[in-house]
Amino acid sequence: AIWHTLLGIETGVEPLITPSHLMLFLGSFLMLDYVFTTRPSKESLDNASIFSAATSYGLVMFITLFINPFLNIWSFIEREDELAAGSVILQAMLASFIFVYVVRFKVSPKQMSLVYLVSFLYISINPSLGEFNRTILICISGLIMSALIYQITKWYQTTNHDRKIQVSAALVAGSYGLVFVLHLLAFSTLNGVDLSWRFYGLGGLVTTPLLFGYMLGNLGVSPTSGEVVR
């Protein structure tokens, strides 16, 4: 699918969600899952497993590129407000879910940040032919996101807070929203376009994901003991 995108063979939403392409994606996920499940240590992740997780996350982001704010950024310029806000919240929740799942394997902060950096590098391929400046901007956003993830993971592993998984998941989702807001402001400045979104609207793109991220964090907690699931 990435190869077809680079060559311009297929564009738009429909090719991404056709059964044939979904089967290709499923095959990719199964191969990546094999690398993940056959890792030497079941208690931790090696570099191959980290790359597998990052690639799986990147594939999900690629499948949903039609509702990815970094790739569908013009929806913020063309006043498609519902789609624009929904894309940020959806992808922020996905970023939070990935954190809740991967952090249980005792990954280092560096490994966790690599998962997010690689996923951003994957989606930066999409606009690389026609809009190289956007590719660079997405890569920079990925670096900022990975730096924030590093700090969040470091805090998660050193704190004894009884709600650390929920707070961390909320911070991941909020960080995604914050990084995108910075990305949007940089994009509008570089391209000389006026944003219709005001300060409180942009602030909502950061605070709303915080709420959903906190709720997703409960998925990493045992409903009986209240402890983090391992």
Regions found by a protein language model. Give the residues of each.
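Aromatic-anchored segments of alpha-helical transmembrane domains
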Residues: 1, 58-70, 116-128, 173-184
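Membrane-interface helix-loop-helix junctions at boundaries between adjacent transmembrane segments
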Residues: 1-55, 72, 76
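Membrane-interface interhelical loops and short amphipathic "cap" helices
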Residues: 2-19, 67-86, 125-131, 188-198
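Hydrophobic cores of alpha-helical transmembrane segments in multi-pass inner/ER membrane proteins
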Residues: 22-38, 88-104, 140-154, 202-221
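Membrane-interfacial loop-to-transmembrane alpha-helix junctions, especially the N-terminal start
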Residues: 44-58, 105-116, 160-172, 227-230
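Loop-centered beta-sheet repeat module
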Residues: 45-97
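A contiguous, surface-oriented mixed alpha/beta subdomain in the mid-to-C-terminal portion of proteins
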Residues: 82-150
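C-terminal transmembrane helix-loop-helix hairpin of multi-pass membrane proteins
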Residues: 136-144, 151-230
